[in-house]
Amino acid sequence: MKYKIIGFTCCFAVILIAVFAPLFYKDYRKTERIHQHEQEIPQEPCTDPADGGLCTYLPIVKIDTDGVVIPGRPIKDDGNNRIYTRAADGETTIAAQMDIIGNDSKEYHHANETADVSSAIRIRMRGNSSREFDKPSYAIRLVDKKGENNPLSIMGMDAHHEWVLYGPWLDKTAIRNYMFYNLAGEMMSYAPNVRFCEVILNGEYEGLYVMTEMITGGKDGARLGLRVNAKHSTFSGYLLRLDHQNAGEEALNSFTTYTYKTPFLLQIEYPGSRNRDARLTEEIRQDFSNFEKTLYSYDYDREKHGYTSMIDVDSFVDYFIINELSSNADAGNYSTYIYKGTDNLYHMCVWDFNNACNNYFEEELPYTGFFLNNRLWFEMLIKDEDFTERIIQRYHSLRKGLLSEESLYRYIDETLDFIAPALARNDARWGSVEQQAKGLLVPVSRNLDSRSAAEGQLKGYLRNRGKWLDENIETLRQYSASSRVKQYNEVND
């Protein structure tokens, strides 16, 4: 298998035999997972500041755009196509200042205190359907005075330069992303770090947000180690995203795209467009196509030349389990990240559980049945008996501990208790849960009118889904039964 050496200064790429890449492999398991809600809540009452401003034990994020409107709101062009607003200079982001108070504090603090962390930023609205919500989410890049990446440790998370301020809106519990990212982080070698915080934008309180580590690679403080400097060269992997194709983004025409195995499109997230030329883009396309061709070939499960030599199998197994348990309807279609690490293997990475656990826009999702067995890449993996058995055994193990009903319920209860004061302030800013719902979910009856109802819905779905999977997880063997996949498994070594 070939691998890349990326020379960013000269913007060229040459081929290196992959056997050398593991010598520089970064083990991202060394970072201990922090679950913010496990910190002790201060027992003494908060001393309100003289100006009556915000007092909280969550970090406070203050953003000042100097009155400039943040771009990225969806609008229609003359052809009735969906486009996004831009800044006055035509850019997709604007310059702003971000200050964080109580960056890693576990005590009460006030909005008028001195910031613990400060940085210039570039900011825009982000998301697909979520850009339509009253409460937007934001993409943030920390920059220095020269406009270069400025990785900083935020809220006790590893230093990074790209962050998402996710504003829960559709999820009335406000904890889906926080909970499932953290659970995935206990299962998998990498999952985005997350922290709850409260946001003040241009002096106005904007409510409860989740500061989220953006999935990116590179040398600039990225915990996802896709680039390692050697003596004379730079070894690099790459990161791809399967999603809607956004205007201005070039799709990667890989094997499953040009053979019409998926209507969704891949984009290269890393290396960024500024750090790759047409030659490097083509090499990534060919390299990933080779993986897909292997996976979709008749000898896909052979030990010598099959998929197992190309992927971190555990990563794909855990991705399957956590997305099936949560019925995360987007997984394998939208917001789906896959990366090739410096270990020369492909890994899956979780992202976006906003629609999970029957919180999907367009229809009510049953708690029965599997869905990832029909999604890209997994539709082939599930044909392999060894892969299916690993899912079954891993699932049973996780249900005895981390993903047991008792453990999940406790996680929900403790997290909701932790953010309760901030949720109350959030609702004072945005109106009652019933007002926020606005019939976004179909049918209308699914638009819950209280936080307690949302909690009950989340717990109820996980209980029913978990019970069904407990009783039916072993039926996954039907997808790898020899009578069903004989045409794929007839090739001998």
Model-found features: residue ranges?
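Regulatory N- and C-terminal appendages and interdomain linkers associated
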Residues: K2-S119, E406, R410-D413, D417-D493
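Middle-to-C-terminal accessory/interaction subdomains
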Residues: K26, P71, E269-G332, K340-D493
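Short, solvent-exposed loop/turn and secondary-structure capping segments
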Residues: R73-I75, H110-A111, P151-S153, R176-N177, ...
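Conserved oxyanion/phosphate-binding beta-strand-loop segments in alpha/beta enzyme cores
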Residues: I100, E107-G167
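Carboxylate/His-rich catalytic cores and anion/metal-binding grooves
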Residues: E113-Y138, I200-L201, A222, N229-H244, ...
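Structural recognition of the beta-strand scaffold that forms the well-ordered cores
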Residues: Y138-R141, H161-G167, A174, E198, ...
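A conserved hydrophobic secondary-structure block that centers on an alpha-helix together
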Residues: V143, L152-L208, R279, S289-I311
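Internal "kinase-insert"/substrate-recognition segments embedded within catalytic cores
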Residues: K146-G147, S189-Y190, Y205-D318
